[in-house]
Amino acid sequence: SLRSAIKQVASGRFGVTAEYLVNADEIQIKIAQGAKPGEGGQLPGFKVNDVIAKTRHSIPGISLISPPPHHDIYSIEDLAQLIFDLKNVNPQAKISVKLVAESGVGTIAAGVAKAKADLIVISGAEGGTGASPASSIRYAGISPELGLLSLTQQTLVLNGLRGQVVLQVDGQLKTGRDIILMALMGAEEYGFATSALIVLGCVMMRKCHQNTCPVGVATQDEELRKRFHGRSEYLVNFFTFLAQEVREHLAEMGFTRMDDIIGRTDLIERKSVELKSVEHMSVEHKSEAHIPNPKHTLIDFTKMLARIDNSAAIRHVIDQDHGISTVKDVAIIDAARDAIEHEKEISLEYTIANTDRAIGAMLSGVIAKKQGARGLPEHTLNVKFKGSAGQSFGAFLVPGVNFKLEGEANDYLGKGL
C-alpha cells in the first residue's frame, strides 16, 4: 500500500486492512462530508479500473457504494471502540473524526472527545466534492464559522474537553486571512482541498463522478489524463505564499506564534457598516455600488463571540490516554517474536476475558509493518484462547495468523478481515 500522511476510514471500508492502516501518520474516521452530510457516497463502476479495484479489494467495473452510516457505529461507545481498534493497529498514528458543521455538532464533538479521538474535524458546507448533488451543495450543512465557534469550541471548553483534542476546520478556505479567522475561532489545523485542486488545474466543471474531467484531474480516462499539467511545485508555491500571508497578519496583530491566537475571540472586531444613501443613484450605479444590507446591523454576535471563562484550556494542551500499553497483544507480540521476525511456526495459548478488547489488532499492525500485505506464511502463528473474548476479537487479522477461541466473543468479531 502506498504511504499517505492521512488515510480515511469511510463507511464502505473498501481496502481498509492492517497494511493500509499502518502506512499513515493520521487515520481519519469520516462520519460525514461537508458538501453532502448524511448521504454516503458512490464511485460509479466505469471509474473503478484495475488499480482502484485492487486497492479497494473489489472488482473492476463494479460500483462501490458507501452507505450513509458506519454499520459498526450507532453510539459514542461504538465510536470509542473503533478509535481503540485503529489505535491498536497503528499506535503512532493520530485518530481523527470528521464531522459536518450543522445544528448539534457541538454535542457530538463532546462525545467524540470523550471517545478519545485525538483530532476533530469540523467540515463546513461551502467545500466538498464536485460529485455531490447540487441540492446538497446548496442547502445542506452550515458555515464552518458557526459549526466551529458557536457550537464546537464553546461546547468543548464549557465541558473541559477542549485541551484533550486538536480542532481542524475546512470548507472553502482560500487565504491567510481565512486561516487567521479560523484560528481566532478555535481551530488549530486547516484543511484545503478545492483551492489545492484549482492550483493543480481544476476548472470546477463538477463532473468528477462522470469520468469526463476535461483537464484530467478527476478521471481514469487515459486520453483525458494526458491533459493534466499540474505539478507539485505549484502546490508548494501556493502553501508557501499562504504561510507568508498568515505570518504578515500575525505580525500586524502583534503576535509571533499561532498558538497565541487560538480561541482568542476577543481579538475579532466587527466591521462598521456605513449605509450609503442610494436615492440619488441611477439603477446602473446602484447595482455596482455593493450597498450593504441594513439588516446586517441587527445581527447580534455577542453569544457567538463570547469566551467561556471557566479556567479550562481553549486549545490542545494534553494528549489523549488510549490505554494501549497494557493490552494483551503486547505479551503476544513478545512471545511471537520468532514468528514475526524469522517466520518460525509457533503455537501459543492464553486465557481471555471480556475486558480484553481488540485482540490481534496490534499484533497484525506489527506484522503488516514488517511483512506488508502478504503477512506471514500459512499457519506460522497459531494462538488458542480460552474464555469470553471482548469486542473486536481478531480485528484486522493478517494472513498467517490463526486464532482459535474456546468460549464466546462479543461485538465486531473479525472486523476488517
Locate each region found by the language model.
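Active-site-facing alpha/beta catalytic cores
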Residues: 1-85, 89-96, 101-112
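Terminal amphipathic helices with adjacent charged low-complexity linkers/tails
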Residues: 1-16, 22, 46-47, 98, ...
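Glycine-rich phosphate/ribose-binding loops and adjacent secondary-structure elements
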Residues: 1, 70-226, 356, 360-361, ...
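Mobile "lid/hinge" segments at catalytic clefts and subdomain interfaces of large enzymes
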Residues: 17, 21-60, 186-273, 288, ...
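Short coil/turn segments at secondary-structure junctions
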Residues: 63-70, 135-136, 226-230, 347, ...
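Charge-rich, low-hydrophobicity low-complexity segments
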Residues: 294-417
